[in-house]
Swiss-Prot record:
It comes from Picea sitchensis. Its main location: membrane. It is found in: Cell membrane. This is CASP-like protein 2A2. Residues 1-26, 90-98, 170-196 are cytoplasmic.
Length: 196
């Protein structure tokens, strides 16, 4: 069974204030702020996605998938901002705090993935239509609406990549606190012969 390593405080590692721990904390803070701009840009573009003519008025709020992506971008921007402020604080990363950050990063990543996937599918149908379901493509007539929604989806996927990398970072931070499991019998034999 894996045992937790003794955690070393980031403050203790910093020493004089210069070192790899401080640089890593600054990098993580900046990297957690990057999705804020991306998510807000995607959110604003989605909110501005509207077009009307004499037959129909299209708005992002008419399409559940686009509303879902707008909510996901808002939630993820807020989380990213809060987690960036949290990463600025020089405190030790205890196992419980690392688990919470890991699980939240995973949840936010999956939220962005789900919102982006659903919006991409709806956008695909809007561009191509679906003959079997007799759904006509609408982007030929409502190009401005589709272009803004499409740009929002693309920016959301860039934010998703940032959240994926943050998930990897938090996973590394969490699981590096544990000893590796005993592999096969080689390590067990070494321990047995050392006791003899």
């Amino acid at each position: 069974m894996a045992q937790g390593k003794e955690s070393v405080s980031v403050v203790e590692m910093e020493g004089s204030g210069n070192g790899p721990a401080v640089e890593m904390r600054h990098f993580e803070t900046l990297f957690r702020l990057l999705p804020v701009g991306l998510c807000i840009s995607a959110l604003v573009l989605m909110l501005k996605s509207e077009q009307s003519d004499q037959y129909m008025q299209l708005d992002y709020s008419n399409v559940d998938a686009f509303r879902c992506l707008a909510y996901a971008n808002g939630i993820c921007a807020g989380y990213s901002l809060i987690s960036a402020f949290d990463s600025m604080v020089p405190v030790s990363h205890h196992i419980s705090r690392s688990w919470i950050l890991f699980l939240l990063d995973q949840g936010i990543t999956y939220l962005m993935l789900a919102g982006g996937a659903v919006a991409t599918q709806v956008l695909y149908v809007a561009y191509k239509g679906d003959e079997k379901a007799t759904w006509e493509q609408i982007c030929g007539s409502y190009g401005r609406f589709c272009n803004r929604a499409g740009a929002s989806v693309i920016i959301s996927f860039f934010a998703l990549v940032c959240f994926l990398l943050l998930s990897l970072l938090s996973a590394y931070r969490l699981f590096s606190k544990y000893d590796p499991p005993i592999h096969g019998g080689a390590k067990l034999e070494d321990q047995t012969t050392a006791q003899i």
